[in-house]
Amino acid sequence: MKLEMICTGEEVLSGQILDTNAAWFANVMMDMGVETQYRVTVGDRLEDLVAVFRERSLHADVILVNGGLGPTSDDMSAQAMAMAKGEPLVENALWRHTLEEWFARYNREMPRSNLKQAMLPASAIMVDNPVGTACGFRVKLNNAWLFFTPGVPSELKHMVHEQFIPFIRSEYELDEQSSVEKLLTLGQGESAIGDILSEVLLPEGISFGYRSFMPYIEVKIFARGQKAMAQLGSITSQVKHALGAVVVAEGKTSLAAEIHARLFQSGFSLSVAESCTGGMIASQLTDFPGSSSYFQQGLVTYSNESKVKLLGVLPQTLDDHGAVSIATVEAMAIGARNILDSDFALATSGIAGPDGGTEDKPVGTVAIALATKFGTYSQMVKLPRRSRELVRNLTAAIALDMLRRALLDEAVIVDYPSVQRLAK
């Protein structure tokens, strides 16, 4: 089965909205062993949509079309599909009834514009959407089934799992004798990881894939076929050994996800005191339901005054060593832990840039500490200064990795190839 994707919307094409739907969909399909072989983004222009539907339907077996099913004038997917096939739009009575019931349930009068969402190409097969007002539909054109989905991420995900995947499984023989292992790495570039893994001898049916997303590189190990799947565990172990300390999680998309799972299960508590990361660590952890079971508090102590008043950092420490120093960040972590007697406390302080650096402490200089009941661990590092965002994201990730290693009773402080150590 040759799978393609067409993404629609002027805001997506112009970059005003980041197209996370396309990345999510391709990732879900890849995990099933189905590769998305072609993707194109089209703006809200009727003639362009018609042309791309006709052209791509000559090459693909299945095309997932995302977006353009709303009630406004720039939602043109249904109209363009009808024109591409040379047939009229007709009202789908079932979906009109569904819309009327939906608005009545909330004691609201249905705007006339929503009737547009019940107008489908004459040959279309309606696809239910129980979580939104835009139904999906599918149409056969030339060689391909075009499967139309809403642009709202939650609605797309529901429709893909509940409708699209069952459809392709029923229509095509998918080679689902496949599996994938995902390793999250930190502190080493993609090219360097690729060079290291080029030395790993891969049996037939096993391949590598890489995904870069700040500040991580995700290594995917794909196995296709029963024999390859049986060897996947052994190859994954070889990869972990080859990469060493830069592997920070397995089967997770972030260190925060790894820490959440471990703290949630362990019963340990955590406090956080952040300066340069500005609440980023607290935000990443509290994004997860259930984080209240372990996350006690997060303090953003950006100024020296707040470090003194809220965390008990001595003014003399700041005068002697500065805000970005081992002494200060250790005092921040100890102060945060003592407030509620947390099992662990993380603290960060640094110069994220683009300004504020000095000759002694240039932009990218960061101090990180982890306070525990058994002692305090700290390090001062120089991070790549490509952007303020990178410095802050990488600082948060290193802090979380220190905590992860403490939870696993491993060496808390390790060297990352792309990070320069200044002190510990």
Curated annotation (Swiss-Prot):
SUPFAM superfamilies to which the protein is assigned, alphabetical: CinA-like (SSF142433), Molybdenum cofactor biosynthesis proteins (SSF53218)
* Xref: InterPro entries: CinA, CinA-like_C, CinA_C, Competence-induced_CinA, MoaB/Mog-like_dom_sf, MoaB/Mog_dom
Q: Per UniProt, what is one Pfam family of this protein?
A: MoCF_biosynth
Entry's SMART domains? MoCF_biosynth
Write down the superkingdom of origin: Bacteria
User: Which residues are connected by disulfide bridges in this protein?
Assistant: none
Q: Which NCBIfam families match?
A: cinA_nterm, molyb_syn, PncC_domain
Q: Which family does it belong to?
A: Belongs to the CinA family.
PANTHER family registered for this protein in UniProt: NICOTINAMIDE-NUCLEOTIDE AMIDOHYDROLASE PNCC, NMN AMIDOHYDROLASE-LIKE PROTEIN YFAY
Name of the molecule in the record: CinA-like protein
Origin species, per record, is Shewanella denitrificans (strain OS217 / ATCC BAA-1090 / DSM 15013)
